[in-house]
């Protein structure tokens, strides 16, 4: 939304959009030796973008953050990564632990999990904040957050509802049944039937959960029907 106009429901402006896009202004692309080979490289120079609303130049900056000092020889994407993983960044840790929560509990504390905004608050903001703070303090220990979630009392809840939580659909008073991912379901069927699904170009015995990318979706009717995402877009 903020590319063409100020965001209608959030605080982000077009300037915020172009400041974020400026981190990628020095990314170059060239053809490789092979027909379908692209080479992505860093172009030297000052990273900047043009705010198309008023045609003013803007420097790279994270959302709600000051512009970092980036030398002309430095890759501005490194500065973006530094901002994303900074302990005072209010976005990365919250988004990360929310996605892990969605993976294990079937629904994020913020739902949908890719719609993190002030006008779509978490059902338990204190819990999300506590998980994010612990994730940061641990040095972004992914195994640690998995261990905490899987050892929690909430994760141990039965999926069989009782008269107190039968109507609950978002407070996590019970475990919500969720559909298996397409890859997991295919591997489970292979195990039960003792018949292995083969994938052209990969070694025999390769399981669906081991596929290196999504190009195999078109070669597997099962994965296509049962919803393995193509990752063709970010939305």
Residue ranges of each PLM-predicted region?
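Primarily short, surface-exposed interaction patches in extracytoplasmic proteins
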Residues: 1-203, 220, 229-234
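Active-site Gly/Thr loop motif
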Residues: 214, 218-226
